[in-house]
Amino acid sequence: MKISTLLCLLLIATTISPQVLAGPDAVSTPVTCCYNVVKQKIHVRKLKSYRRITSSQCPREAVIFRTILDKEICADPKEKWVKNSINHLDKTSQTFILEPSCLG
């Protein structure tokens, strides 16, 4: 009886410990990493947004493109087509921001 109680307490302590050590910050800030990147160019007409992955917790820097079909694709930020796509998306997003003020 004493051994089963001890094992039960040990199991509970083991289950609770990682949650306490992780703390509230680990729960509120999930980290997205790219482990593989696409090899082929994605046409800019298929892309609608992007975000950069620069976390020190990730094995590599990357850009995640979101397509018009809401798929996320990891790409190498050093690739020329990736830089061109980012520039294009930046310009089109600025155009959309400025349009309402131009209407008067």
Swiss-Prot record:
Its biological purpose: Chemotactic factor that attracts eosinophils, monocytes, and lymphocytes but not neutrophils. Potent monocyte active chemokine that signals through CCR2. Involved in allergic inflammation and the host response to pathogens and may play a pivotal role during early stages of allergic lung inflammation.
GO cellular component, one term: extracellular space
Alphabetically ordered keywords of this record: Chemotaxis, Cytokine, Disulfide bond, Inflammatory response, Secreted, Signal
Main localisation: secreted
Subunit structure: Homodimer.
Tissue expression from the record: Predominantly expressed in the lymph nodes and thymus. Also found in the salivary glands containing lymph nodes, breast, heart, lung, brain, small intestine, kidney and colon.
One BP annotation, GO: immune response
Entry's localization field: Secreted
Family membership: Belongs to the intercrine beta (chemokine CC) family.
Name this polypeptide is given: C-C motif chemokine 12
Induction record: By interferon gamma and lipopolysaccharides (LPS).
Signal peptide: 1-22
Highest classification ranks of the organism: Eukaryota, Metazoa, Chordata, Craniata, Vertebrata
MF GO annotations: CCR2 chemokine receptor binding; chemokine activity
Superkingdom, natural source: Eukaryota
One Pfam family recorded for the sequence: IL8
Disulfide bridges in this chain: 33-58, 34-74
